[in-house]
Amino acid sequence: MLGLSATGVLVGGLWAWIAPPIHAVVAITRAGERVHEYLGSESQNFFIAPFMLLGLLSVLAVVASALMWQWREHRGPQMVAGLSIGLTTAAAIAAGVGALVVRLRYGALDFDTVPLSRGDHALTYVTQAPPVFFARRPLQIALTLMWPAGIASLVYALLAAGTARDDLGGYPAVDPSSNARTEALETPQAPVS
């Protein structure tokens, strides 16, 4: 779980580095009202940035579950539970680190307090930090944080379904065909005449 927490820091830092900011303009209308508008398709970054975080967390979930599957002697439900807890923690850390880094990089933006230029056209171009979550509702935040655990559980279940042995290949390996051979050797044979 500590390893997954450390990767959460890396994922949060990577997301903060590649997440696109939102560019906007703040202006005063002729009626004296302060307005703001996003430039071009910049408003799409409100969706793109959180989706990029989900993509990075999904990659982490697939890689982590595949690596954990290699740890043969501990395969089973306890590993899935630990993987789920670790990935949920990693997602929370990634979201926290990402939000902190973009906040430090772009600062907090309040459209009502942006200083405007003087002159005929009172306007200012601003850059807004990308959001970490799609919305600020608790359910959407919880689903975002639990997303990698669900992906990892799905990958782990597919790997378990593809295993031919009931013990998921754990150690010590028990080969049913070798048991049949030893039983056949121990069974007394009737003399052949």
UniProtKB/Swiss-Prot annotation:
Entry keyword Transmembrane helix: yes
Residues spanning the membrane: 8-28, 46-66, 82-102, 141-161
GO CC, any one term: extracellular region
Record localization: Cell membrane
Membrane topology term: Multi-pass membrane protein
Keywords: Cell membrane, Membrane, Transmembrane, Transmembrane helix
Residue ranges the record marks as coiled coil: none
Domain of life: Bacteria
Main location: membrane
Family stated for the protein in its record: To M.leprae ML1222.
Name by which UniProt lists this protein: Uncharacterized protein Rv1591
